Amino acid sequence: MKKKIMSLDYSYANSGICVAEVDLSSPSQSHSESDKIVILYSDVFLSDKKLDTIPRISGLIDKILELYDKYKPDIIVRESPFIGRSSTAKNVLYAHALLESELYNRQLKIEEIHNATLKAYCKKYLTDKAFYTKEELKQFDKKQVVAEFLKAYFSSDMPEIYTKRAKLLDDKADAICLSVFYFEINLK
């Protein structure tokens, strides 16, 4: 049986998005034993800065729902909202409220995963599988931890999470990581 996961690192300005397909037909101990998760789509959606707040958010939600309609995922997973600066708080809260409302109107379920839970999972994976010691992980910031996790998890099948100039697309990486986390914790 196959299931599709849509995962969102959703925010006001830009949102990482991933659609992954997992094969649940035969149990496996780890990803490397059997390619059980396939990234069908991943990208960063940018909202239109020229628009006022609500139309800007609506445009972003429309893009997400178009992708939902194309892939028909079984579950939507979102990273919990995080507000880094008070100047952006209102718009981030609007964005999440409008997304929740639209999904509710379509009777679509969304699961939320806290950022700290996701990062802790990545660190645990990297230390448990002996890619790094806890001390070695201290050299990385949170964004780099996710990138290192994805490199370790996917190995040679690594999804593209860097620009041509080697800049980490952290929103995209987080969205992919959310799909992997949901698969490993809830579907395996």
Map each language-model feature to its residues.
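Phosphate- and other anionic-substrate recognition elements at nucleic-acid/protein interfaces
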Residues: 1-188
